[in-house]
């Protein structure tokens, strides 16, 4: 396994992943529907996740696109960021969205989390991701979701890397095999005071 810097870990996850997403209430009971997420919908579901890390004139850029594969209505969501002083700073996602960071927990461990948790936006929506590389082409992600300052549910994701090339759509991408990879929506209103639930 490579070193444990943020860039090392981002590179470790580069590729196309097939994720199976399940949800649980705080007591561990399995959920059949996620009513609290940015995009409410059925559970479990499956998605393709394209993860790319590239150097742009000496600046390390991160790009990710999630594409629903089955279990929910078709949907694509893209987001990205830039490594600054060794830490991934995500592009702001929309009105009142906090600064999100990608930080390292050591080799094979990434955490996507707000830079600060003391703003009013955190009281409305807060969902840190804990991502772990299991070796080979396997990974897990755990997302805890808080709404109104209260824990609501936990997502558990089990992923298998199906391609090492995130620059091309895989053949079974619901959007079709041709076209740009990172063409999903990039804004969200879940942090806004008036927040229609429309984004994941």
Give the role of each language-model region.
Residues 2-3, 7-200:
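Soluble ligand-binding/transfer domains with enclosed cavities or grooves
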């Amino acid at each position: 396994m490579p070193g444990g810097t943020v860039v090392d870990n981002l590179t470790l996850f580069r590729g196309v992943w097939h994720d199976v997403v399940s949800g649980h209430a705080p007591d561990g009971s399995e959920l059949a529907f996620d009513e609290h997420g940015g995009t409410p919908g059925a559970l479990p579901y499956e998605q393709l996740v394209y993860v790319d890390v590239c150097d742009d004139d000496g600046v390390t850029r991160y790009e990710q696109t999630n594409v629903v594969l089955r279990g929910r209505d078709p949907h694509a969501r893209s987001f990205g960021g830039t490594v600054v002083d060794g830490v991934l700073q995500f592009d702001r996602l929309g009105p009142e969205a906090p600064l999100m960071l990608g930080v390292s927990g050591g080799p094979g461990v990434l955490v996507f989390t707000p830079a600060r948790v003391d703003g009013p936006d955190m009281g409305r929506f807060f969902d840190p991701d804990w991502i772990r590389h299991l070796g080979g082409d396997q990974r897990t992600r755990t997302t805890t979701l808080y709404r109104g300052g209260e824990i609501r549910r936990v997502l558990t994701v089990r992923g298998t890397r199906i391609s090492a090339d995130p620059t091309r759509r895989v053949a079974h991408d619901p959007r079709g095999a041709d076209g740009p990879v990172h063409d999903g929506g990039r804004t969200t209103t879940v942090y806004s005071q008036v927040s229609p639930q429309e984004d994941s």
